[in-house]
Regions:
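Short catalytic/signature loops enriched in Gly
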Residues: 2-11, 27, 81-87, 107-108, ...
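The feature captures the beta-strand-to-loop junction immediately N-terminal to the Walker
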Residues: 47-48
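Conserved ABC transporter NBD signature motif
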Residues: 70-81, 162-166, 171-173, 178-186
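Conserved ABC ATPase "signature" region
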Residues: 237-254
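Conserved ABC ATPase signature
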Residues: 259-263, 267
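A short, proline-enriched helix->beta-strand linker immediately N-terminal to the Walker B motif
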Residues: 278-282, 298
């Protein structure tokens, strides 16, 4: 792992993330080569129209999908690794070598004098292929190991931390009245540490507050489910944590015995938020948490997330399609279009100097509260075929200004830099 991946300020790093789905012989590239990083304590907004791949990106990060290729690093440790890119590279390498060998054999058949030299070239090509395939197989093995065992390594670290904390205290408490209580506390902490998974440090708030809650479970059972799964059996402790979290999200402890159908949409979303934050996560993925709510309730939920961010030191990946909401809540914003990241910048920079035509189109669609200004608002219609010429020069995500990335080719990069006066 390189030094960059160990940067303590970077909580999550997504590298070349691809998430493809196959259906009836067709491959749907839902997320295609997406790169970004999220720093500790910030809100990173991910925006785009419906179907652009933003929700799939969030679900891939939390391992609800097995990613096709790419890497996802969390707290300096690889938690997701796809292998399809290595498989494709191995296939391409085999084909290239086979074509070269066939060409050399045809040349040797046509001119026997070149046979000895060509045989040496063939042996060299086959040796190179063997070395390349061995390297790719090792990459695949390492990727599969990290994908499967990242939780085990994290649990081992937690167990070591618990032992380092409690063993000296237990030694000092030998023969004292408090020894039994300390032993019990140590065993409980050790049991929880052994069952803790790194992925539990990432929690998700789902878009639909109705569908994401089990109608047969009480609010107490819904919120405490994560604690129970992680081995906590002390019912008094669980109840106290549930009551504490309910009050934190603006509900009361009497709500703990009720069922989801007894709540309004905003209250259900608060229950969903409580379920996520009771696990004390470091990263919260909020998948359009306000899109199904009324405007007045949206403001309440956004304010609640802001309060929780400050109180619990949360880092938030905020997925939305409403740029007016994202603007006031996010520190940085990434814009997605058809599975690609087309622009990434700070919130202020993106709204002040949008560069990609699709970003300009999204911003022009935001309605203005002043009716006179609304009448003068000009819509920008994005047409990918007309707005770009990628016939010879293909685009990539480039840093056209410090911290401002745009998907463009060489000609567009020069134009964007000129727009910014660089």
């Amino acid at each position: 792992m390189d030094e960059k991946r160990n940067d303590p300020e970077v909580l999550l790093r997504v590298e070349h993330l691809c998430q493809y789905f196959k259906s009836k012989g067709h491959v749907n590239r839902a997320v295609d080569d997406v790169n970004f990083e999220i720093h500790k304590g910030e809100v990173f907004g991910l925006v785009g129209e419906s179907g652009c791949g933003k929700t799939t990106t969030g679900r891939s990060i939390i391992k609800l999908y097995d990613i096709t290729s790419g890497n996802i690093w969390f707290k300096g440790q690889r938690i997701c690794a796809g292998t399809q890119s290595y498989v494709d590279r191995m296939s391409a390498c085999r084909k290239k070598t086979a074509d070269a060998v066939r060409a050399l054999k045809r040349e040797s058949a046509a001119d026997p004098a070149k046979k000895a030299a060509n045989d040496a070239k063939i042996a060299s090509l086959e040796a190179e292929l063997k070395a390349s395939l061995a390297a790719d197989r090792e990459e695949i093995r390492a990727a599969r190991y990290d994908h499967k065992h990242s939780d085990r390594e994290y649990a081992d670290k937690l167990v070591a931390d618990v032992k380092a904390e409690y063993l000296p205290r237990l030694e000092a408490a030998k023969g004292t009245p408090g020894e039994a209580a300390l032993q019990k506390e140590y065993r409980d902490r050790l049991r929880v540490a052994k069952k803790t998974k790194l992925i539990t440090q990432i929690q998700m708030i789902f878009q639909d507050p109705v569908a994401s809650l089990n109608p047969r479970m009480t609010v107490r059972e819904i919120i405490s489910e994560g604690l129970v799964i992680n081995g906590i059996k002390d019912q008094a402790y669980i109840d106290e944590k549930v009551y504490e979290i309910l009050e934190l999200v603006g509900l009361v402890r009497e709500h703990a015995g009720r069922y989801p159908h007894e709540f309004s949409g905003g209250q259900k979303q608060r229950v969903g938020i409580a379920r996520a934050v009771i696990m004390n996560p470091e990263l919260l993925i909020a998948d359009e948490p306000v899109s199904a709510l009324d405007v007045s309730i949206q403001a309440q939920v956004i304010n609640l997330l802001n309060e929780l961010r400050a109180k619990l030191n949360l880092t938030i990946l905020f997925i939305a399609h409403d740029l007016s909401v994202v603007k006031y809540f996010s520190d940085r914003i990434g814009v997605m279009y058809y599975g690609k990241m087309v622009e990434l910048a700070t919130s202020d920079e993106l709204f002040a100097h949008p560069l990609h035509p699709y970003t300009k189109s999204l911003l022009s669609a935001i309605p203005l509260p002043d009716p006179h200004l609304e009448k003068q608002r000009t819509r920008v219609i994005y047409n990918a075929i007309a707005d770009h010429d990628y016939s010879t020069d293909l685009p990539s995500l480039r840093e056209v200004a410090p911290g401002h990335f745009v998907r463009c080719n060489d000609a567009e990069e020069k134009r964007y830099r000129k727009e910014l006066g660089l």
